[in-house]
């Protein structure tokens, strides 16, 4: 909770208490990886890499030096900007799946790489995003019944600000014009 609360001093102190009490390096590292994803998320995507690297390094190095590696990761995660947008996104998506069941995937997204797929319309009118400006094209990705739903809503902290701005910009630009593939793109 001290990492979530952005208190590196408390995070390192409680790490020391857990180590002193004999808690396993594996358990501590696992909790750090969870915190990096659950509480930091895309506000600082590097936090998960730091936690995973610390877990691997601490396991390989062993105690007593593993405590230094874990302290470095705990301090980093505690000081990182925070976001729980991924937690909220998956919770909302899981609830939607529970409520709506197994909705059909839009036919243009369905696998077209097998004999008979064309007869079923699979892949027909699929637009390859990399053929379009900004590598983005407006098309239905969610089941039609969920059209317009937003599960992931980036927050206003750290890197999520850039994610939000990027998504708004490419959607705005795509909405302004009729989208055609870039020159040289396959159709």
Locations of regions flagged by a protein language model:
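Terminal-proximal interaction/regulatory segments of ATP-powered molecular machines
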Residues: 5-136, 143-187
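Active-site flanking loop/helix segments enriched in acidic
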Residues: 1
């Amino acid at each position: 909770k001290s990492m979530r609360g952005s208190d590196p001093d408390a995070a390192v102190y409680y790490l020391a208490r857990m180590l002193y009490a004999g808690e396993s390096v594996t358990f501590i590292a696992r909790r750090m990886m969870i915190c990096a994803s659950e509480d930091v998320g895309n506000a600082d995507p590097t936090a998960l890499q730091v936690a995973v690297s610390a877990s691997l390094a601490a396991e390989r190095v062993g105690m007593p030096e593993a405590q230094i590696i874990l302290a470095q990761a705990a301090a980093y995660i505690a000081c990182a900007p925070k976001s729980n947008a991924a937690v909220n996104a998956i919770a909302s998506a899981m609830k939607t799946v529970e409520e709506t069941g197994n909705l059909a995937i839009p036919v243009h997204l369905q696998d077209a790489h097998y004999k008979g797929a064309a007869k079923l319309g699979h892949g027909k009118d699929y637009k390859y995003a990399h053929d379009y400006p900004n590598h983005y094209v407006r098309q239905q990705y969610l089941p039609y019944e969920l059209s317009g739903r937003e599960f992931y809503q980036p927050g206003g902290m750290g890197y999520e600000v850039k994610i939000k701005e990027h998504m708004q910009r490419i959607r705005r630009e795509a909405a302004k014009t009729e989208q055609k593939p870039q020159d040289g793109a396959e159709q």
